[in-house]
Amino acid sequence: KTNTGGEGSKHGIWHEAIPDVLQRAEWAGLAVSGLHMHIGSGADLNHLATVADSLERTARDIGRSLTMISAGGGLPVPYQEGEHRADMSEYFKLWDTTRKRLEDSFGHRIRLEIEPGRYLTAEAGILVTEVRAMKRQGSKKYLLVDAGFHTLARPVLYGSYHPMSLCPTSTTPPHELEAVAIGGPLCE
């Protein structure tokens, strides 16, 4: 499973290593000009406020050489009923307020970058696949389709939910609804 953040991730620099990184940058004659934080793609503004405070504290540790802050990790996309869209105006206001406080503190302009991630494209397409076979294996019924994780990797990589709809090919009334497993042509 892909791990894009936290202590065990291959990405970025864990916050406890920042003092060492700053010391190395100074030794090499480099000024740290940007700070990027991978925040995850949650819509919980209370959590984001905590993350913004953490970014601001780290920015102050870096100091006046900083000219850019970046909130990465993407914006949330609702896939299931009950999930909410991000309140974009509140999301921006939170990060812009952080940026302005840093500008006031440092006395120069701070650029704000926001990484939208899959937010821009997640709802831009539809995968259409065809049920090629039905099969019972023990107590489970499988619908075998002509698309697999090579076509739609997110559920396999992240264990994420992906909505599906069935489009009947006949006008015959459907049978009772039942839970089925969907399988593709690969050994997923």
Can you describe what each PLM-predicted range is?
Residues D44-V51, Y79-Y91, T121-A133:
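Short glycine/threonine-rich loop-to-helix capping motif typified by GTGT followed
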Residues H15, E83, W95, H162-S165:
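Generic alpha-helical secondary structure signal
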Residues M37-G42, I69-P76, Q80-G82, G117-Y119, ...:
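Active-site beta-loop-alpha junctions enriched in small/polar residues
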Residues R109-E188:
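Charged (often Lys/Glu-rich) extended helix/loop segments that serve as interaction or gating elements
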Residues F106:
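Nucleotide-activated donor-binding/catalytic signature segment of Leloir-type glycosyltransferases, i.e.
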Residues E7, H11, H47-A49, M68, ...:
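Broad hydrophobic/π-residue packing in well-ordered secondary structure
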Residues S33-H47, H84-E90, L166-E176, V180:
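A broadly tuned preference for mixed-charge, low-complexity surface segments
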Residues K1-S70, V77, L94, T98-E103, ...:
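Active-site-proximal beta-alpha core segment in soluble small-molecule metabolic enzymes
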